[in-house]
Amino acid sequence: MGEGLLSGKVAVVTGATSGSGRAIAKRFVQEGAQVYLLARGKERLQEMEEQLGSSAVGIPTDVGDPDSVRAAFEVVDQQQHKLDVLVNNAAIYRPVPFDGLSDDEIMVQFRCNLLGPIYTCRAAIPLLRAAGGGDIINTSSEATIESFAMLSMYAVTKAGLEALCQALRTEYEQEDIRVTTLVQGVALGEGGGSTGWAWDPEHSATAFQRWEQDGIMRRIAGRYGGQSVDSVAELHVFICTRPRGQKLDVVRSRSY
């Protein structure tokens, strides 16, 4: 779509059909990137392709399934032979008391929030290397800083993601592969993740009441109730277009 800050770049965005992921994908295309959209829903991917044109390619992908991730990155490799930017945005969460967590509720969050980035980073690094270096932006959460009642598994998975970022940063910095942890606060338009995982109304009401009582909502949402997804997208462009040789290990983004 013409010249831009990301002209000639190839990007992969997970969770690309809703919330911040959708905004990031759209902004990357506006800046001239060829963007591969990874998400589970075929219809929403097709809608994004129609909206963004030939600069966007949707690949139905379950990031928690290693075979699905391999297949997605094989498409990128076959068509582009390189990758410049990986954005791990896909995530899922819902409020549940810790002692009420089912095995499935635990594993669904681990597969999407932690195993997903592990699988995508593993698949992306050879393609980033082929490009002569690039950027991985992994979206973490203020749940690793603030203690949110009833979001224990979400916090655990995001803390694990931050440890992954640290490890990859050390291992691949000599290859000019930069790994940025984006500790993202509340974004307007975000939900409980892009997988359509329904929230229990009773648990949700209890959780929001606790968060209000604990003062967490006021601290993380600020005066405006959260940051816009467009501002989150703008931040992603900044992170991956800053001068080579400049590292941003951890970025904390929130409303005020």
Across the structure, where does each feature detected by a protein language model lie?
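Substrate-binding pocket helix/loop in short-chain dehydrogenase/reductase
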Residues: P97-F98, S102-F110
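The beta1-alpha1 cofactor-binding region of Rossmann-like NAD(H)/NADP(H)-dependent oxidoreductases
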Residues: T61-A71, D103
